[in-house]
């Protein structure tokens, strides 16, 4: 057996640019990001205007404005690369297939999740503010669940009605080690 030559002397380089037609053969794609769908050949054939010799007599002439010829619901599907080969994900259409297609573009059903906020009709959630005692209790529970300070520090760290001005709070700790208001006795 003789080794093959590295360069075929009869091969001539193509002088001009080559146009690549869209093809859906196995492993062929328009770019590295274009996936081929098994229904594309049907759409490509529909997009080309057939001559009278190629068209059977019993087939009706369909205008391009009527949509892509989808015969039944099984013709509209999606492929999932994680599923076994050949398994399809059916696309549930709300309209008959002939009405769901428009100018070679599949009209998908409306999304399940809406971008608009639906107002709540229940009155269970009120927008009233918590009282000071409720805030202290809630802050204490949160800090206890995180294993932080004692509840005495929680009460002094929150602004209270007896010490409304944060400037009047002294920086040196009181007898119990907590901060105290300058105008109050501890």
Swiss-Prot record:
One Gene Ontology cellular component: nucleus
Locations listed in the record: Nucleus; Cytoplasm
Keyword DNA damage applies: no
Chain segments carrying region Disordered: 1-25, 148-186
Tissue: Widely expressed.
Organism superkingdom: Eukaryota
Positions with biased composition (Polar residues): 148-163, 177-186
Record has Ion transport as a keyword: no
An annotated GO BP: negative regulation of DNA-templated transcription
Signal peptide positions (record): none
Keywords in alphabetical order: Cytoplasm, Nucleus, Repressor, Transcription, Transcription regulation
Purpose: Involved in the transcriptional repression mediated by the mSIN3A but not the N-CoR corepressor complex.
Subunit annotation: May be a component of the mSIN3A corepressor complex. Interacts with SIN3A and HDAC2.
Stated name of the protein: Histone deacetylase complex subunit SAP25
Species: Mus musculus (Mouse)
């Amino acid at each position: 057996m003789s080794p093959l030559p590295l360069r075929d002397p009869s091969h001539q380089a193509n002088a001009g640019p080559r146009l690549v037609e869209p093809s859906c053969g196995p492993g062929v794609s328009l770019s590295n990001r274009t996936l081929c769908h098994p229904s594309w050949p049907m759409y490509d054939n529909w997009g080309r205007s057939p001559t009278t010799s190629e068209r059977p007599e019993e087939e009706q002439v369909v205008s391009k404005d009527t949509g892509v010829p989808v015969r039944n619901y099984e013709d509209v599907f999606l492929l999932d690369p994680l599923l076994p080969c050949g398994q399809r994900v059916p696309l549930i259409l709300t309209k008959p297939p002939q009405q769901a297609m428009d100018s070679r573009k599949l009209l998908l059903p409306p999304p399940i999740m809406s971008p608009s906020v639906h107002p709540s009709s229940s009155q269970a959630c009120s927008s009233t503010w918590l009282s000071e005692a409720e805030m202290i209790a809630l802050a204490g529970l949160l800090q206890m669940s995180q294993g932080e300070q004692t509840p005495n520090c929680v009460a002094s760290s929150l602004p209270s009605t007896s010490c409304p001005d944060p400037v009047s709070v002294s920086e040196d700790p009181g007898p119990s080690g907590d901060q105290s208001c300058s105008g109050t006795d501890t």
